[in-house]
Amino acid sequence: MTAADRKLLESFGRALAAQKLRLVYQPKVSLKDGRLTRVEALVRWDDPELGPVSPSRFVPLAEQHGLIDPLTEWGLRTTLKQWRTWREQGLETRLAFNISAVSLQRLDFPDLVERMCRAMGVPTDRLVLELTEGATQPLVRLMDTLTRFRIKGMGLAIDDFGTGYSSLLQLRQLPFTEVKIDRCFVKDLPSAHDSRLIVRTIVDLAHGLGLVATAEGIETIEQLRCVRELGCDVVQGYLVAPPLDPGDLIGWDREFKKRWPALLSDESLELWGDVEADTLRQR
């Protein structure tokens, strides 16, 4: 381990123990009617000395040095508590929560998640657990764990689909409920013919297996229109909303419902041009 990584790990451990991390929530909406279908919980760490630290830096260290389980439990508990607050305020939605392949090696993990849902008063069918495609490789070991999640009523999404090496047979064998199409296939839409073909193929595959097809990284109206034309069910990205602080979600939902009818109309480019620019500047 480098000195920089050691310092980062020590700082992260202190931040986790002191609950100095925070969660933001990025909405996902249905392409059928613009309705909020779920929100994805995303961890953020703003260190006083290091500044904002990307999860791509601290999550791998947490996985390698025994901190991923406490991070997961803190994040899940915080997310479930926030769901209950939203519900008390009149907002109904589902939750999407990312889990590490390391956590999936725990035999008691499905039971732990179920107990946490029960303790927080959150029905298990309100929770969708997201796994990156790379995490699905040890299929024989994961099959039992993932099946137990499904038996308990939780949804399972395969994230960043198309960027790893999982076979179509493996996708069929695993009990997923949702496929998330990676943003690398979305960014060149609608002009790139090969990207259109790949997205169409993934959507057809997902629907053929009875899965929901979600497009990530939607940043322009043209991309939104294209994935809708290609048959996607759900979209997520900065055109819809950046990751939001929990207190901002209800206000966003109210305003987005007003904007949705015009989003796919001929006037939408004029109406939404400033929104696109503003949200992208927040990245």
Where would I find each of the regions flagged by the language model?
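Conserved ATPase "switch" residues in P-loop NTPase domains
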Residues: 16, 87, 150
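Structural preference for long, well-ordered alpha-helical segments in enzyme cores
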Residues: 8, 41, 61-62, 75-83, ...
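Catalytic core of bacterial c-di-GMP phosphodiesterases, primarily the EAL and HD-GYP domains
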Residues: 31-40, 65-141, 217
